Amino acid sequence: MLRRYCISAILSLVCLVAGAQSAPLVARFDPANGVLPTPNNLLFAGSVDGTLNIPVADPSDPASATVQALNALDGFSTTGPMIATFSSALDPASLVAGVTVRLFEVELENPVLNPATDSPFAVTRVVQELNGEIDFTVNLLATDPAQSTIEILPLRPLKPKTGYMVALTDGILGQASAAPAFPDLTYIFARYERGPLINPDGSSRFANLSDSQAQALEPIRRLVVAQEHAAASAGLRKAHIVLSWSFMTESTDDALRAIRAGLTALPFTLAPTGLDTASVQGAGLADIYTGTLQLPYYLDAPTLIPTVVLTTRWRGANEAEITRYNPQPVAPQTLSIPVLASMPNAASGQSQPASGWPVVLFQHGITRNRTDLLALADSLAAAGLAAVAIDLPLHGITDSDNPFYNATMERTFNLDLINNETGAPGPDGLIDPSGTHFLNLASLLTARDNLRQGVADLLQLAASLEQAGFDTNQVGFVGHSFGAIVGIPLLAVDDGLIGPASLVMPGGGIAKLLESSASFGPQIQASLAATGLIPGTSAYESYFRAAQQVLDAGDAINYAQAAADKHPTHLVEIIGPPPDQTIPNSVPGAPLSGTEPLLQTMELNSAGTTQNDSNGLHIAVRFLSGAHSSLLDPGPDAEVTIEMQQQIVGFLASAGTLLPIDNTSIVFQP
């Protein structure tokens, strides 16, 4: 009876305090009706393999595909927002990161690692508190016209496989009345710390809580009590908390590290074509070679069903999802893929060292192919650097008249699934353009694993270089656009295979990057509009949040710091005006999307003059003119192409200790 009185007294107090206003401000929390702050560990409930278990009403409904993709993940986004809803409009000035909105890194009881726990995902301690406006920011959610929803945005990627806890306080005020927020009545029950909500026989201990309600709320109560105890240990008084929740971030690099750990050389051969770069309008300083590389293909190739490329994804043994608990993907087949290489010839004035040519791995951008290497080959050859290029997954040469076309090995698989003129589904008798199906946003897991396959392919190439006679102690990397995006995870997990790297116009936060791209955005928005997702709506933004969560394990932003920590790094950005029209420098409302967030996460110094450092440089160069294609195409601005290529060559040839900047008039001076 005493406990019944205590909880009733608490509820009465809330009602009395709130009685002075017609509509008290309440932090919404009603798990029984699906009203939860997100991301939230309650969405693991019922999982048997450590993946999310978000309810899906009808798995056969195509509209549920996005949720089903989320349910293949072992946690929540490292880059996405945290969201909570209140009962009425909020005063935005009262939303202060680190003051009224607190974010903590915490340790959690992981039921997969500790099956004996009786409190799955309970917070056990605070590791550290994150800094407001340095690690995260908070604002009103733009798509909520009621102005009653808050959005907490990381300014740096959260750690993978890590627990986090959010606590909102009564310093959050209503917009109309300036009155403080209160906890939801359900949350008041959930924070009750004087004992269980149920008796040993399962009946409720409280008159205003039914047996079924108490039974459902009791496991949540244990989590909330643990959260508030942890918050109190960090100096936050429990009486000031109006809502708290916790979540665990997903794994990101586990699968790629598993692949790297088991990596061995596979057959890699090259043969001269009898052509040099003069045959492709170059200076003729490099001879052109073609060959093949064997590699494990962790996706399904379209041997019998062409459309399998639209839905395939990485799987473990027994078709298990790839997670931190099961990181090793199984390759359904080994493919032989085409390789293009360039090597300095006599016209370059260079002689091959006894140890073999120093070599640069080159990765082209989306919708391009391996022949993009040839636009850079002469500059590399003049410095005594050979180069090797392979295609990104689902990319390749589609013109059968191209002398480097390989009819049986192109990784476009000669697919004809769309009309090349209109983009409409259905064959037109022509091979689909290179990369058409690479970022398939209708199957987010496929898009993620096409990115990861690109990394795995480059790892295999790097591990097999010695078979073609290259000097494996002098290996550099150049990635352009999406080639640089794939290159950053490569550099984070390569463990010594590669040295210095030049990353030309990369970007992170892929989902909003694509949506905000002047090149890709209109097509993506039109495709989503055809499914009923309209820009500016809540459903539209929810899709992009989900897309980013799925793509996180293949997104450069989650690998950027590790990549820069391990490699001398040179990053190129076009800031204009106009700025890069393909990979945006930054994206309003998405602080981890674009090139600038990568640059910041990698902690690169901006430079406008020649730089030296015997320990290796970490430099970003911002160009004031040029275009996204300027690395390879002098058309938009020949001076920019010359300067970019000279920077790359000087940087790689010096093992990342020298960055020559000759034309200072076309680069930003910090």
Across the structure, where does each feature detected by a protein language model lie?
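Bacterial N-terminal signal peptides
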Residues: 8-17
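Cap/lid segment of the alpha/beta-hydrolase catalytic domain
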Residues: 303-331, 335-336, 352-357, 361-459
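Acidic, low-complexity Ser/Thr/Gly/Pro-rich repeat segments typical of extracellular/periplasmic
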Residues: 21-305
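Conserved acidic catalytic loop of the alpha/beta-hydrolase fold
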Residues: 341, 351, 444-445, 456-473
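Catalytic active-site module of serine/aspartate enzymes centered on a nucleophile-bearing elbow/loop
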Residues: 632-670
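The feature captures the conserved acid-bearing segment of alpha/beta-hydrolase catalytic domains
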Residues: 506-642
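Short glycine-enriched nucleophile-adjacent loop
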Residues: 478-479, 484-495
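A short, hydrophobic beta-strand element of the alpha/beta-hydrolase
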Residues: 502-504
